[in-house]
Amino acid sequence: MMKSISTWKQELTKGAHAARLAALYCCTPDETPAQAARYAAVLDGLETTFGAHTEAGLYSAPGRTEIGGNHTDHQHGRVLAGSVNIDMIAAAAPNSLNQLRVQSEGYDLCVIDLDDLTARKEEENTTASLLRGECEAFRQRGAKLSGLDVYISSNVPKGSGVSSSAAFEVLVGVILNDCFMDEKVSPIAIAQIGQWAENVYFGKPCGLMDQMASSVGNIITIDFADKANPDVEPVQVDFSKAGLALCILDSGADHADLTDEYAAIPNECRAVAAVCGGEVLRDVPFETFLANIPACRKQCGDRAVLRAFHFYADNDRVPQQVAALREDDFDAFLQMVTASGDSSWEYLQNVIPAGYKEHQEVAVTIAAAKHYLSGKGAVRVHGGGFAGTVQAFVPVEMLADFKANMEKILGAGRCHVLSIRPEGGAVL
């Protein structure tokens, strides 16, 4: 929705969007001025970077938390995930250059020509590749693309396991959908577009869970058995009523040089599936996998076999977690969160990058969190693993001490206490 920049600023200052912002950020209307100021700041950034514009739109895409199903999505498995109340926001306005120009705070300006949307090998692992890929996906869906200037600001920590990359992809998708498709593309399709751009243009073999959680929003369970039409179901749950706080612990490690570690997981799982006659592990019954373990060990190696064991167990846990949440059986839910985390460390092996000795930040974070929880709540590696974050469900009466103790180890501001956001990618 485009409005004049002066109108946006007046409305934001006067609190005209307080109710909307309160819903997006899980706070009271009285607590929204800080969020309104963020949107006013991206409008300022848009004009400072690109010059005066007559009108602009405002957009948001949330980070996500993976609650169940660690590395199951790329094997067409099940996941449990939710959007959270930290996000990436943008102001976007038309330009007459037939270029998509994107300025993210703290990064270099990125410009792509909308007349040339072909994938470029030399552009892999760059922001330009994601932009080019998403624009091409919208063009294929009938979008009449034209020049656009975008200014982005984020409070989603980069490389933190809350999935800043998915939030970026969803944000761009929401903008293109609003500006060129009258919001006709569904949240599920926007997620699929982001994944396609990341796989084909960016060159990273990712699953679909991150994009789906950010785009669809709230808590959802997704079954990717039919990859083209994943089954998405809402799961109504209020962790605060259970006396639990959701904490995301930033270990301080960075994903930057770990693409090969991430890629090895889906590659090894697919290799096991191939030995067993499938494309992905979801194609292969567990009994068939068991019968083929000797051949899998020989052809794929033992780590691949262990990763397959993790997939089957964590994939089965997801519907059990959903059932427990729907029945308000939080004790059973927490036991399964713990079991998932143990499986990720022991079998999936995505806590410590291969060969790392001095730097094992995620492992230290898990060990410290378990110590301070003293058998209460639950702790698990969060998201892709190897670096980034750890998820903890913390009894609210322990939260203050837990946060203080963890930040003594990790550093100030490293324990994020989050809420589940009720909406995914959004046009303000």
Question: Where are each of the predicted segments found?
Answer:
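C-terminal nucleotide
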Residues: 1-64, 89, 93-124, 221-380, ...
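Glycine/serine-rich anion-binding loops at beta->alpha junctions
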Residues: 60-76, 155-171, 375-393
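Structural signature of FAD isoalloxazine-binding scaffolds in flavoprotein oxidoreductases
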Residues: 78-97, 216
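DPxDG-like acidic metal-binding loop motif
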Residues: 83-85, 162-182
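Beta-strand segments within the central parallel beta-sheet cores of soluble alpha/beta enzyme folds
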Residues: 101-103, 147-154, 184-196, 334-339, ...
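Glycine- and acidic-rich phosphate- and metal-coordinating loops
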Residues: 135-157
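Phosphate-handling active-site elements
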Residues: 140-148, 176-190, 396-409
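Alpha/beta catalytic cores of group-transfer enzymes, especially the acyltransferase/condensing modules
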Residues: 182-230, 235, 340, 366-369, ...
